């Protein structure tokens, strides 16, 4: 925009001074149109101190062919185009060209749908409806509630839909008490849709995530964006979206009767149990699990008409990270599968809950791994012994406590470390190395299988509970870590020792020593746009705020 202004000669250095001089000379407003054209004159180039003669070249942007101006304006950010339209009347006319706004919609928001195709082919309209509005439609009445694309332009899409609701695009965590969640608001064709990410059914941690639409925004008519709630089984209905403050917005359903089912709460509970958890009442034998599931259903029903969302970011990555940070789904015993976020902070890896449970709610740091404390696993036969595994972990914990007491005593005495101690404290952190080759052999008689140098055999110790037996039988590295446990209502929280196991780039596990339990985590392979944190400081601040959202 600034470049165009300089080329046009507007501002204090060009047309504005001429306009002020003419007004001072008594010129009336009838000359404004002529002045606008004067303001877009391009100054002659000066080469070697003399004006370069170019009699056949355009001397102003107004003399350029319209298609070239369209190409120039199409490359500018959409937020700058309204200011450009104020330069002169011809610019305003050119900016009504829909090609400009079509390119801005595609480059800034990824809109690839063709409005003109949608208006002439009913099949495309039906595809749009079935895919994004109501996947259960079976009748031919869908045309009655489709947007009026025939009289719509890309400028309407950009200004009244994409630009107006740009602040809600990205990742969000709903405020549903301890349960949390993961919402991804994206531009999907000519719609803005909020997709709630649900873990696969327990215990299939390696399966893909399930997506459930929560709300959608689109233009039913020009200059009129419509917000619709997608809860329930009766199709989309009226809703509202309010941007509360920066990085926070809320949704409200206007027609909550669309959420109700003819069979009452019992039918709603059975449907929710089948769709969200993949279970039936007959599958749940344990009374404690029945209480947990019923409690979650009652809690969620209280938020089906109004929800508040807070922005979260994808964790930043560095080249020296142990593995790529991101979102994972993990097993948490009777609580089922939950979504967590792995992030790295120097020599510490943190795993934060995105979804939670009544014991440890969403937003809390479920795991903390000390990457300077690698643990060398024994061979498979000794690894099956839980006491041997426990001894390895507790030895590392005891060493940490001794170092902490030693540091505390030195601070209390008011003395710095001696030469020997100072030399010890300045030693670099242990090198993160894979297990040695002696531990990489699997018993097999003469036909022993030799594993790669950076991989060793792994098996869960006897007595450690796992949701299923489909866990990797080899790992790359192991580290000492702590896990957060608490009573119901997040009472008496404490960190207990455990073992972090890195299986591969997409899977890791954690053995909870005190609980004799094993959690397996698998990476979410979904790609999230507009989810990067503006800075590392902003991400750290978000992590701190998340812990206060649910406490």
Swiss-Prot record:
SMART domains: FBOX. The keyword Zinc applies. It is found in: Cytoplasm. Pathway: Protein modification; protein ubiquitination. The keyword Hydrolase does not apply. Gene3D superfamilies: 1.20.1280.50. Keywords: Cell cycle, Cytoplasm, DNA damage, Metal-binding, Ubl conjugation pathway, Zinc. Residues 12-38, 402-459 are annotated as: Disordered. Zn(2+) binds at residues 229, 237, 253, 259. Part of a SCF (SKP1-cullin-F-box) protein ligase complex SCF(FBXO31). Zinc-binding is required for the structure of the protein and facilitate folding. Substrate-recognition component of the SCF(FBXO31) protein ligase complex, which specifically mediates the ubiquitination of proteins amidated at their C-terminus in response to oxidative stress, leading to their degradation by the proteasome. Fbxo31 specifically recognizes and binds C-terminal peptides bearing an amide: C-terminal amidation in response to oxidative stress takes place following protein fragmentation. This is F-box only protein 31. It comes from Xenopus tropicalis.
């Amino acid at each position: 925009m600034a470049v165009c202004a300089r080329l046009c000669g507007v501002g204090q250095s060009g047309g504005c001074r001429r306009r002020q001089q003419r007004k001072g000379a008594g010129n009336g407003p009838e000359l404004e149109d002529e002045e606008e054209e004067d303001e877009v004159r391009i100054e002659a180039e000066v080469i070697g101190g003399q004006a370069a003669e170019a009699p056949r070249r355009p001397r102003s942007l107004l003399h350029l062919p319209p298609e070239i101006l369209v190409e120039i304006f199409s490359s500018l950010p959409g937020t700058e185009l309204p200011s450009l339209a104020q330069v002169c009347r011809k610019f305003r006319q050119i900016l009504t060209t829909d090609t400009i706004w079509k390119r801005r919609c595609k480059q800034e928001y990824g809109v690839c749908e063709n409005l003109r195709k949608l208006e002439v082919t009913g099949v495309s309209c039906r595809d749009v409806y079935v895919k994004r509005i109501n996947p259960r439609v079976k009748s031919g009445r869908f045309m009655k509630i489709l947007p009026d694309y025939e009289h719509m332009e890309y400028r309407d899409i950009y200004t009244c839909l994409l630009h107006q609701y740009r602040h809600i695009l990205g990742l969000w965590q709903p405020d549903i008490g301890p349960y949390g969640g993961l919402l991804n608001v994206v531009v999907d064709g000519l719609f803005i849709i909020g997709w709630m990410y649900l873990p696969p059914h327990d215990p299939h941690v390696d399966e893909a995530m399930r997506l459930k639409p929560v709300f959608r925004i689109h233009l039913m008519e020009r200059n009129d964006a419509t917000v619709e709630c997608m809860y329930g089984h009766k199709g989309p209905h009226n809703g509202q979206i309010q941007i509360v403050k920066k990085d926070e917005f809320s949704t409200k359903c206007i027609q909550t009767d669309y959420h109700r089912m003819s069979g009452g709460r019992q039918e709603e509970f059975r449907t929710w149990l089948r769709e969200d958890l993949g279970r039936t009442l007959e599958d749940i034998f344990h009374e404690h699990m029945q209480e947990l599931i019923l409690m979650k259903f009652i809690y969620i029903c209280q938020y089906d008409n109004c929800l508040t969302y807070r922005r979260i970011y994808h964790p930043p990555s560095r080249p020296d990270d142990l593995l790529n940070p991101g979102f994972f789904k993990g097993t948490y015993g009777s609580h089922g599968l939950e979504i967590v976020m792995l992030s790295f902070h120097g020599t510490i890896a943190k795993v934060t809950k995105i979804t939670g449970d009544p014991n440890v709610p969403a937003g809390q740091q479920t795991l903390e791994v000390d990457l300077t404390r690698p643990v060398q696993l024994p061979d498979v036969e000794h690894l099956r012994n839980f006491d041997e595994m426990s001894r390895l972990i507790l030895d590392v914990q005891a060493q940490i406590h001794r170092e902490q007491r030693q540091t505390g005593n030195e601070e209390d005495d008011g003395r710095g470390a001696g030469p020997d101690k100072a030399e010890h404290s300045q030693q670099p952190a242990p090198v993160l190395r894979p297990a040695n080759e002696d531990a990489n052999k699997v018993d097999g008689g003469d036909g022993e299988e030799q594993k790669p140098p950076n991989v060793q055999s792994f098996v869960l110790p006897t007595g450690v509970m796992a949701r299923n037996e489909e866990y990797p039988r080899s790992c790359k590295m192991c580290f000492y870590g702590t896990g957060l446990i608490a009573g119901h209502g997040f009472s008496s929280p404490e960190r207990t020792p455990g073992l972090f196991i890195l299986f591969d780039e997409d899977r890791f596990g954690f053995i909870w020593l005190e609980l004799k339990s094993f959690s397996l985590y698998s990476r979410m392979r979904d790609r999230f746009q507009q989810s990067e944190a503006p800075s590392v400081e902003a991400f750290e601040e978000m992590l701190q705020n998340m812990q206060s959202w649910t406490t």
